[in-house]
Amino acid sequence: GDNYFNLVPKSMPGLQWWGDICVRTDIENIKKIDTKSGKESILVTLEEVNEALKNGKMPYKLTGHIKPLRTLMAASLPWGDRNVITFTQYDDRPPGQKYMIWYDFSKKKIVNLFNLQGEGPTNFDFCKENGCMAYTIGNDLYVAHEGDFSSMVNPKVTGNQQQEKDVVYGQAVHRNEFGIMKGTFWSPKGTYLAFYRMDQSMVTDYPQVNTTARIAELVPDKYPMAGMTSHKVTVGIYNVKDGKTIYLQAGDPTDRYFT
């Protein structure tokens, strides 16, 4: 009846956990929520972040200038023991370089940033021992060093282009079975980065469909059906210092699963 909408639970966008503390991000603020009383208090404001981006001292010399943020909705607080929010933003160089940026709201300054190559970076894996960030774009794996430099871990294709397009680096393998939820693993001292290399060239395409487009689009996916040929996975070791990669000699990868 007329009272229906008063009884419907209201959603609260932007909720996340900062350690054991519940926080909420919105356009202009990030707020801490008292879980007993529901009272909110401001942790950081958009104005403070943009002031640090515009006039604050950057930890590294950059080629361009970071653009101001329009919202804090996409910011995150990944570490419960640190007063740091992370977000991505572009600089003012056409077509725009994308950065992963860390802002310390207790010090009110930018404390770290990474230049991310290309569009759609994901699978971020930070190593506090060496200050590097591993991430993927498409099928490729990168390591971003602090400041204005990133290096590709997997070598650029020089041989079979068709085969290499079906090889995935640095992502979860085996369809996320066996508890595999990521594809990069830093060594204890940050000297090396272990990563999965998944060759899917022998796997048949499964006709997935993207229904979010105006007209549905075919987006084939490499999906090993039961009883059919599966992909082959090997483990690479990337040396951060010299940029060289070796692969573990673990025998024939056919129907083997590394966890």
What does each model-identified segment do?
Residues 1-259:
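Beta-propeller folds
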